[in-house]
Amino acid sequence: MYNVRTDLAVESREIYKHRYNREIDGVVFEEKTVEEDIKVTNVDILNEEGAKAMEKPIGRYVTIDIPEYTHYDGGIMDEVSHVVAASLEELINLPEERTALVVGLGNWNVTPDAIGPKVVGKLMVTRHLKKVMPDIIDDSVRPVCAIAPGVLGITGIETGEIIKSLVEKIKPDLVVCIDALASRKLERVARTIQISNTGISPGAGVGNHRMQINEESLGIPVIALGVPTVVDAATIANDAMDLVLDEMINQADAGKEFYNILNNIDKNEKGMMIKSLLDPYVGDLMVTPKEIDDIIESVSKIIANGINIALQPNMVLEDINKFLN
């Protein structure tokens, strides 16, 4: 069977529904619009049956779809940050004096994969200040620390091992991970933010299966945030072929032999054929938008502000920005 690469729970549900023409038992789906043009979708996987069908762990997956023009409008960026913060706050059940560790996953030398390290560079980190300047830093300010541990190819160390060692040493009460994701739809690239309470498997979307970073491996809650920055080239080619076929079917005379041939094409076999044709020439090619540098800069700011607001509930965004500047 032709498997589409995606890290997004909302897309896994769409693929299942399209393939079997029914909803998934053990999965609850809820969709709402919270701000103008900002849509929030909750996908709750309730049991093992739902987890098996979705190929994802049991838990909540929040998907925030943002307008296309977000990256060029500072006001919309702040609105999205507040929506991200609100979604995070629903998943974070942590007293304000408890410590949070934020981990920016990814390779800072590869732009589509640099979103995690970029977010870390924009965070309000306070753990050291609480120790160095206890008289100046208010008790209502949460101790937050952050790290961008790089990737296995740079450090020679599994990212999960680095984080596990840090957790054992500094003993945070919560880990928040940020990583780049893969999508099956080009229109979702850089326009979707996924938040989950199930942890993360770094690099899974592009076929690199590393040590999982979750509550089971670390012993504390793990919240994962991600933004799709790449799409599998075979998926783009397959979608383009679908558009061509649909248009040819619309133009053909219903009931005629050519119409029946087009209508009976097995889309699963077509997907496998396209992948097998592309593999010798491009391998596992992933595609990203040409404006990815600007996109990563704006999305990292949105996510960083969302995390800052969620982890510092006693501060408003204006005060956080003053602190950072």
Swiss-Prot record:
Propeptide stretch(es), residue numbers: 1-7
Segments passing through the bilayer: none
Any single biological process term in GO: spore germination
A Gene Ontology molecular function term of the record: metalloendopeptidase activity
Stored InterPro entries: Pept_HybD-like_dom_sf, Peptidase_A25
HAMAP family the UniProt entry points to: Germination_prot
Entry's family note: Belongs to the peptidase A25 family.
Protein name as catalogued: Germination protease
Organism in which the protein naturally occurs: Clostridium perfringens (strain 13 / Type A)
Taxonomic lineage from the root: Bacteria, Bacillati, Bacillota, Clostridia, Eubacteriales
Gene: gpr
